[in-house]
Amino acid sequence: MQEVIKMQNADGSWTNQVLIGKFSKNKEYATELSKKVNVSVVITKLVVLWIQKRHNTKQYSLILKKAQAWLKRKIAEEAIDEEQLNKI
């Protein structure tokens, strides 16, 4: 877990593409989606979902808030369909 936390960028995003294979339930879909939309959005969404599902969200609340704020901004700026992201 700490390894993943250390990978978070100062803006709240994650960009290491290895994380797609590590956290995606549907790797093919996530890989294809990352070709259509900002790959950092896909990776960050995957990490946020993983933390929420598998770890104490209170302990990681600041990390999650920063990531979610970044996601919200990028989704709006790039007009990304959140339904597509929710399928990953």
Per-range role (PLM):
Residues 1-88:
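Preference for long, amphipathic alpha-helical scaffolds in soluble/luminal domains
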